[in-house]
């Protein structure tokens, strides 16, 4: 069993923002597998998919980005999921829009959602997919990440969401190191 968490902020006003690209990826997986989202007792929305016989628990924390770890750790404990079977999907300002990067470990890189997860799971050694949203050319980062993707960037971000979902489906049956080699 694997736990796949897409990071984002709950609520309609954040739905299509750069900061919610993690939610968009797990939504894509739920859509592909036609599975509903249900509210969990651990302050998140969960959906269960089955890929080649491997159960994957998709989760969208409802804690807001900066407290994502408060949802992830209890779900890991409840389902008895080991850290090597966890994968976190989130936005990355340091990658161009539409680029994805898979890693097995690393720092939070200034991402508050990842800081929270690292704090709660007590390690930096877990799988992740970083989805590029680029940095703003001007203005504050907070306004940028909480803004929607402009029309010109939508084809690139849709492609990145699809590619990320493909990589996650591969992770159901393939060691993450091999998935990294295929998608990086």
Swiss-Prot record:
Q: What is its EC number?
A: 3.1.1.29
Site: Discriminates between blocked and unblocked aminoacyl-tRNA. Where? 9
Q: Which residues bind tRNA?
A: 14, 64, 66, 112
* Biological-process GO terms, alphabetical: protein quality control for misfolded or incompletely synthesized proteins; rescue of stalled ribosome
Fetch the Pfam families from UniProt.
Pept_tRNA_hydro
Q: Pull one GO CC term from this UniProt entry.
A: cytoplasm
Which positions are catalytic residues?
19 (proton acceptor)
Q: Where is this gene product found? A: Cytoplasm
Q: What GO molecular-function term can you cite, just one?
A: peptidyl-tRNA hydrolase activity
- The answer on whether this UniProt entry bears the keyword NAD reads no
**Site feature: Stabilizes the basic form of H active site to accept a proton:** 91
Give the principal location in a single coarse category. cytoplasm
In terms of superkingdom, the source organism counts as Bacteria
Q: Is NADP included in the keywords of this UniProt record?
A: no
CDD domains given in the database record: PTH
Enzyme class, spelled out? hydrolase
Task: Tell me which UniProt keywords the record has, alphabetically.
Answer: Cytoplasm, Hydrolase, RNA-binding, tRNA-binding
User: Which reaction(s) does the protein catalyse, per the Swiss-Prot or TrEMBL entry?
Assistant: an N-acyl-L-alpha-aminoacyl-tRNA + H2O = an N-acyl-L-amino acid + a tRNA + H(+)
Spell out the family assignment given in the record's similarity comment: Belongs to the PTH family.
Function field: Hydrolyzes ribosome-free peptidyl-tRNAs (with 1 or more amino acids incorporated), which drop off the ribosome during protein synthesis, or as a result of ribosome stalling. Catalyzes the release of premature peptidyl moieties from peptidyl-tRNA molecules trapped in stalled 50S ribosomal subunits, and thus maintains levels of free tRNAs and 50S ribosomes.
The annotated subunit structure for this chain is:
Monomer.
Protein's UniProt name: Peptidyl-tRNA hydrolase
Q: Which gene encodes it?
A: pth
């Amino acid at each position: 069993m694997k736990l796949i968490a897409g990071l984002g902020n709950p609520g309609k006003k954040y739905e299509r923002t750069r900061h919610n690209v993690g939610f968009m990826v797990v939504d894509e997986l739920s859509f592909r597998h036609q599975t509903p989202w249900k509210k969990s007792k651990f302050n998140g929305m969960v959906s269960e998919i089955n890929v080649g016989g491997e159960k994957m628990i998709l989760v969208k924390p409802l804690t807001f980005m900066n407290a994502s770890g408060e949802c992830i750790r209890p779900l890991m404990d409840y389902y008895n999921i080991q850290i090597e079977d966890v994968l976190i999907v989130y936005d990355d300002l340091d990658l161009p829009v539409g680029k994805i990067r898979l890693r097995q470990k690393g720092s939070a890189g200034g991402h508050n959602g990842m800081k929270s997860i690292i704090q709660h799971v007590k390690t930096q050694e877990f799988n992740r997919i970083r989805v590029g949203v680029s940095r703003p050319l001007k203005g504050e980062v907070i306004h940028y990440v909480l803004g929607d993707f402009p029309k010109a960037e939508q084809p690139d971000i849709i492609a990145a969401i699809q590619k990320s979902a493909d990589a996650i489906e591969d992770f159901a049956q393939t060691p993450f190191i091999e998935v990294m080699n295929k998608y990086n």
